[in-house]
């Protein structure tokens, strides 16, 4: 898991490939 941040930050700019997570609030960490 990742660990969800206390506040939802703006989703990162969309690159050539889809985001590793929906919404953009939780960073992809294990």
From Swiss-Prot:
GO BP term, pick one: defense response to bacterium
Sorted UniProt keywords: Antibiotic, Antimicrobial
Biased composition annotated in UniProt, kind: Pro residues: 1-21
Region entry Disordered, spans: 1-30
Superkingdom of source: Eukaryota
Cystine pairs: none
Extra remark: On the 2D-gel the determined MW is: 6.5 kDa.
Family the UniProt entry places it in: To bovine bactenecin 7.
Role, per record: Strong antimicrobial activity against P.immobilis and M.luteus, less active against E.coli D22.
Protein name as catalogued: Antibacterial 6.5 kDa protein
Lineage per the UniProt record: Eukaryota, Metazoa, Ecdysozoa, Arthropoda, Crustacea
């Amino acid at each position: 898991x990742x660990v969800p941040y206390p506040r939802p930050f703006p989703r990162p700019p969309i690159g050539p490939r889809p985001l590793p997570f929906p919404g953009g609030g939780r960073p992809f960490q294990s």
